[in-house]
Amino acid sequence: MAEDEGYPAEVIEIIGRTGTTGDVTQVKVRILEGRDKGRVIRRNVRGPVRVGDILILRETEREAREIKSRR
């Protein structure tokens, strides 16, 4: 796949909701192609998402911060 098209990644785990209104879902994805093939990273996703979905990531360098529990 060409670099300008993105990198496919499979959702392997849904971690939780984040964002001020809970409209963002934090997920763990496994990169399927490219330089980081096989790497598992944490990303934030907007919109509906399920385990097994394939996302196209523009880049695989950045990783979302872990969701902290509120006290």
From Swiss-Prot:
UniProt-recorded Gene Ontology molecular function terms: structural constituent of ribosome
InterPro entries (alphabetical): NA-bd_OB-fold, Ribosomal_eS28, Ribosomal_eS28_CS
Keyword Ribonucleoprotein tagged: yes
Disulfide bond entries: none
UniProt GO cellular component terms: cytosolic small ribosomal subunit
PROSITE patterns xref list: RIBOSOMAL_S28E
Record's keyword terms, sorted: Ribonucleoprotein, Ribosomal protein
GO biological process terms, semicolon-separated: maturation of SSU-rRNA; ribosomal small subunit assembly; translation
Gene3D superfamilies: Nucleic acid-binding proteins
Protein family: Belongs to the eukaryotic ribosomal protein eS28 family.
HAMAP family from the UniProt entry: Ribosomal_eS28
The name this protein goes by in its record: Small ribosomal subunit protein eS28
Species this protein is from: Pyrococcus abyssi (strain GE5 / Orsay)
Name of the encoding gene: rps28e
